[in-house]
UniProtKB/Swiss-Prot annotation:
InterPro entries: HD, Homeobox_CS, Homeodomain-like_sf, KN_HD, SIX1_SD
Effects seen without this gene: Morpholino knockdown of the protein increases both cell proliferation and apoptosis in the otocyst. Increases proliferation of neuronal cells and decreases the number of cells destined to form hair cells. Disrupts myogenesis by interfering with the proliferation of dermomyotomal cells expressing pax7 and loss of myog expression.
Location, primary (coarse class): nucleus
Protein name (Swiss-Prot/TrEMBL): Homeobox protein six1b
Residue ranges: DNA binding: 124-183
Organism name: Danio rerio
Region Disordered: start-end pairs: 167-238
CDD domains assigned to the protein according to its UniProt record, in alphabetical order: homeodomain (cd00086)
A cellular-component GO term for this protein: transcription regulator complex
Function: Transcription factor that is involved in the regulation of cell proliferation, apoptosis and embryonic development. Depending on context, functions as a transcriptional repressor or activator. Transcriptional activation is enhanced by eya1 (in vitro). Plays an important role in the development of the inner ear, where it promotes hair cell proliferation and inhibits proliferation of neural progenitor cells. Required for normal myogenesis. Plays a role in the development of fast muscle fibers throughout the body, as well as the development of craniofacial muscles.
UniProt feature, compositional bias: Polar residues: 191-204, 226-238
Gene: six1b
Length: 284
C-alpha cells in the first residue's frame, strides 16, 4: 500500500472516501474531492473513482460526460444496477426536456429501446423495466402463492433477486393493480351481456303474434255485420222494381258469406247467383 505521489492518500483510501461520500449523499463534496485528485492514470482508472465520477456527472446534469464514462470502461457486475439507473434516468430526463412533458410507461419503453444499455454495465441478459427475467420469474412464482408478501418476505425476495425492497414492493403493487383492473373489466363485460339477454327475453313472442292477428282481423268485417260488398249491392238494387224480392235474396246470401270466406269460388257464386236472377227478372 503505497502513498500516491504528492497526495496524502493511498488508492484504497481514495476509493473508500468516494464510497462513503456517495452513500452519505455528499455529492458536491465528492465532486470537489475528485477534482483535487492528482493526475495519475492508475488512480483515475480505479472503478470506485470512475463510479464516483459518473454519479457526480449525473448530479450536475453533465450527461455527455456520464455516457462517456459508462461506455468507456468495463464495470464489475455488482456496480451494474446503480450505473444502469444513471444511464436510464439521464436519457429519460433528456427526452422529457425535448418533449416538454413527463414520460409515461410507453415513453420510457421507447427511450430504453432507442438507447439500450451499453455492454460495459450490462451482462447481456434480457431486461424488462430494468428487471432481469430471472428476477421477474421469482416474483411471479411468489405472487401466485401470496400476492401480499410481508416486509420480511419482501427483504428476502430483494436479496434473492438482486433488487431493492422498494422495487419488490412496487412490482407487487403494480401487479395487483393490473389484476384488479382486468377482473373489473371482465365483470363489466359479463354484466353487459346479461343485461342484453334480459332485454331480449322481455320481448315476448306473443306480443308480435298479437299485433299480426289484430291487423288481420281489422281487414275483415265482424261476423255479426253483413259484408260491405253485399250491403252496397243491396242498396243499389233497392232503386229498381222488384228490389224487395232481391233484397231478401241478397240479405240471405250476405248472411252466408262469412261462412264461405275461406272458399273464394263459393263466395263468388253466392253473390253473383241472386244478382243474375234479379237482372233477368228486370229485363223481362
Amino acid at each position: 500500500m503505497s502513498m500516491l505521489p504528492s497526495f496524502g492518500f493511498t488508492q484504497e483510501q481514495v476509493a473508500c472516501v468516494c464510497e462513503v461520500l456517495q452513500q452519505g449523499g455528499n455529492l458536491e463534496r465528492l465532486g470537489r474531492f475528485l477534482w483535487s485528485l492528482p493526475a495519475c492514470d492508475h488512480l483515475h482508472k480505479n472503478e470506485s473513482v470512475l463510479k464516483a465520477k459518473a454519479v457526480v456527472a449525473f448530479h450536475r446534469g453533465n450527461f455527455r460526460e456520464l455516457y462517456k464514462i459508462l461506455e468507456s470502461h468495463q464495470f464489475s457486475p455488482h456496480n451494474h444496477p446503480k450505473l444502469q439507473q444513471l444511464w436510464l434516468k439521464a436519457h429519460y430526463i433528456e427526452a422529457e426536456k425535448l418533449r416538454g412533458r413527463p414520460l409515461g410507461a410507453v415513453g420510457k419503453y421507447r427511450v430504453r429501446r432507442k438507447f439500450p444499455l451499453p455492454r460495459t454495465i450490462w451482462d447481456g441478459e434480457e431486461t424488462s423495466y430494468c428487471f432481469k427475467e430471472k428476477s421477474r420469474g421469482v416474483l411471479r412464482e411468489w405472487y401466485t402463492h401470496n400476492p401480499y408478501p410481508s416486509p420480511r418476505e419482501k427483504r428476502e425476495l430483494a436479496e434473492a433477486t438482486g433488487l431493492t425492497t422498494t422495487q419488490v414492493s412496487n412490482w407487487f403493487k403494480n401487479r395487483r393493480q393490473r389484476d384488479r383492473a382486468a377482473e373489473a373489466k371482465e365483470r363489466e363485460n359479463s354484466e353487459n351481456n346479461n343485461t342484453g339477454a334480459n332485454k331480449q327475453n322481455q320481448l315476448s313472442p306473443l306480443d308480435g303474434g298479437k299485433s299480426l292477428m289484430s291487423s288481420s282481423e281489422d281487414e275483415f268485417s265482424p261476423p255479426q255485420s253483413p259484408d260491405q260488398n253485399s250491403v252496397l249491392l243491396l242498396q243499389g238494387n233497392m232503386s229498381h222494381p222488384g228490389a224487395s224480392a232481391y233484397s231478401m235474396t241478397g240479405l240471405g246470401a250476405a248472411q252466408s258469406v262469412h261462412g264461405m270466406q275461406g272458399h273464394p269460388h263459393q263466395l263468388q257464386d253466392s253473390l253473383l247467383g241472386p244478382l243474375t236472377s234479379s237482372l233477368v227478372d228486370l229485363g223481362s
